């Protein structure tokens, strides 16, 4: 029986070659197969093309590597996102790659934001084009991300469309099928286990007016056992309670049995901090020690069930602090995931590192670490007790990127971060991010994928390749403009690092507003998207300028103007900008306010 991914790889090659002028390559004799040498290799010569890989998914990655080698550039997902080279001679199609092994084994993206089925499928199709090999569907079902789009949260100008359970299950199934077709590794769940253990759906950060039926299973916080801020997924359990732990473990085993199509199952605790249990028994240990014991229970239960499920565990918030006594009994089942959600993106990871003193942990009075050095010291402490498989789980395109109006600063930070991973014994990187983080360009995503695939590609090479394909002969004009915007931007300010009153930054935002307002835009499709970005930048930088000067009323008025503009353009810019997410981050982190109902 023919493997669907190998067949897809051959079809992909033919489809792309058919786009070339003169139809060169349409009659190629194409062969695909599996081999043990590296991740993939290929040879295209004299009308014959041979692609081999260690897995069918790696064969597809080899096909895209070849297409990039002959001049294709995959700028962003969906229609119009592929640059087709102008090749005029058959020999232009000849290329060879000896057995190649990717620089990092884990190269993935985690779903965030508000997502339609079409945009999600386009994104999954785009992932292997730039070297990614994994996609993470958060929660037991990724309902929350689809609901945000179809209900048009934060955009009252579009009619909401409620989805049934059957429809949501269908969306999840189509996404999983698209991943399987391309040989993309499937990661699932993460948060939500605590909600499931209490009898509530683990499908998002949904609020409830109901109280937990068995309150004794819920963490005791501020003298009460109740849902944290009304959200079951953000609520910790009383992990000293054997019944609470058993319920959580049973949910993990049930899900593992019912979901055979995944490659990695993430087992995390609640998605908030300073809300762990303060009962007498829980205070005898640390939440990290309790977490390790829960993971050991999960391993034992999966072993008894005969399930080889790979479990990903999380270093995040309270769990950044290494356990004092507990240790994993079967470390081979586990993969460590380091998630420094509170770090700055104004500074990249260093390639050499000396641990620093970390702030002592105080139960439910923790301040999240912002410096790169303190976050990395937590990782260093965990690595003293776990030396197995691991990857970084980071957030450059989750919140901070909205503060970089040119996307060039965040792209370079990404590049430098990835080139530092091996200094921390990491096997890769997964970005928790909006799928539509493409405004003004998809360059940060492009840099991320190709750097993880092949760390030898220079940043300058990627920059020239991407921008010349995106903007044509005047690409340097676009690059210079975006570089200047980035030089004046602050990812930290938008991400709520530091005081809101910043007259020094206000000057920068004034310059950004002037630059974007005066930029002369040539004709062309991608240039038209840059025209939208200029107006976007004028409005948002104006709101930020007022906020930095302490003019809250004016800042909110300007922010409402910005929201009205992007809402009115949402369908036209759907592939590039997540309107829900930029508004959500601006309200919950940056400091803007919208009137209720807007």
Predicted regions mapped to residue ranges:
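Short amphipathic C-terminal alpha-helix that caps PH/PH-like domains
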Residues: 63-67, 447-448, 466-467
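Contiguous, structured surface segment used for ligand recognition
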Residues: 1-103
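Aromatic-lined carbohydrate-binding surfaces of glycoside hydrolases
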Residues: 33-36, 48, 56, 82, ...
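Surface-exposed helix-capping loop/turn segments at secondary-structure junctions
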Residues: 23-24, 258-262, 304-309, 520-526, ...
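Catalytic domains of carbohydrate-active enzymes that cleave complex glycans
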Residues: 425, 450-598
């Amino acid at each position: 029986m023919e493997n669907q991914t190998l067949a897809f790889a051959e079809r992909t090659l033919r489809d792309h070659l058919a786009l070339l002028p003169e139809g060169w390559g349409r009659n190629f004799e194409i062969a695909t197969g599996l081999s043990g040498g590296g991740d993939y290799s290929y040879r295209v010569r004299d009308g014959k093309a041979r692609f081999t890989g260690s897995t069918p998914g790696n064969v597809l990655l080899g096909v895209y590597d070849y297409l990039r080698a002959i001049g294709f550039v995959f700028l962003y997902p969906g229609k119009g996102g592929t640059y087709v080279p102008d090749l005029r001679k058959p020999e232009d199609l000849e290329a060879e790659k000896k057995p190649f092994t990717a620089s990092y084994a884990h190269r993935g993206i985690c779903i965030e934001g508000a997502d339609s089925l079409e945009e999600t499928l386009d994104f999954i199709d785009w992932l292997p084009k730039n070297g990614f090999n994994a996609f993470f569907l958060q929660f037991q079902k990724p309902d929350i991300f689809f609901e945000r789009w179809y209900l048009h949260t934060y955009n009252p100008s579009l009619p909401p469309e409620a989805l049934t359970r059957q429809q949501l299950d269908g969306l999840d199934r189509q996404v999983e099928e698209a991943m399987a077709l391309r040989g993309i590794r499937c990661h699932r769940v993460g948060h939500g286990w605590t909600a499931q253990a209490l009898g509530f759906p683990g499908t998002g950060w949904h609020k409830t007016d109901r109280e937990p039926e068995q309150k004794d299973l819920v963490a005791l916080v501020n003298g009460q056992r109740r849902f944290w801020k009304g959200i079951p997924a953000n609520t910790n359990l009383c992990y000293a309670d054997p019944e609470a732990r058993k319920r959580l473990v049973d949910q993990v085993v049930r899900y593992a049995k019912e979901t055979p199509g995944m490659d990695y199952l993430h087992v995390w605790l609640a998605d908030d901090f300073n809300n762990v249990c303060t009962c007498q028994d829980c205070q005898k240990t640390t939440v990290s020690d309790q977490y390790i014991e829960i993971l050991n229970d999960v391993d034992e239960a999966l072993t008894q069930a005969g399930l080889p499920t790979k479990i990903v565990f999380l270093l995040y918030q309270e769990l950044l602090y290494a356990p004092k006594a507990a240790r994993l009994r079967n470390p081979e089942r586990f993969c460590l995931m380091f998630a420094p959600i509170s770090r700055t993106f104004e500074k990249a990871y260093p390639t050499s590192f000396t641990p620093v003193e970390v702030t002592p942990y105080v139960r439910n009075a923790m301040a999240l670490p912002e410096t790169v050095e303190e976050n990395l010291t937590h990782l260093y402490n965990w690595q003293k007790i776990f030396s197995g498989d691991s990857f970084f789980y980071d957030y450059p395109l989750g919140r901070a990127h909205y503060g970089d109006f040119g996307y060039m600063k965040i792209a370079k930070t990404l590049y430098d971060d990835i080139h530092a991973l091996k200094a921390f014994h990491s096997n890769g990187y997964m970005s928790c991010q909006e799928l539509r983080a493409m405004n003004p360009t998809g360059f940060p995503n492009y840099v991320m994928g190709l750097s993880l695939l092949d760390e030898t590609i220079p940043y300058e090479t990627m920059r020239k390749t991407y921008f010349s394909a995106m903007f044509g002969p005047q690409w340097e004009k676009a690059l210079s403009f975006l570089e200047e915007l980035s030089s004046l931007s602050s990812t930290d300010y938008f991400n709520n690092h530091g005081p809101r009153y910043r007259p020094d930054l206000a000057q920068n935002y004034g310059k950004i507003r002037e630059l974007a307002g005066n930029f002369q835009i040539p004709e062309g499709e991608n240039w038209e998207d840059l025209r939208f970005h200029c107006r976007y930048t004028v409005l948002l930088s104006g709101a930020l300028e007022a906020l930095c000067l302490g003019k809250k009323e004016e800042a909110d008025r300007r922010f409402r103007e910005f929201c009205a503009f992007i809402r009115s353009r949402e369908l036209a810019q759907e592939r590039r900008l997540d309107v829900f997410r930029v508004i959500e981050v601006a309200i919950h982190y940056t400091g803007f306010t919208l009137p209720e109902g807007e």
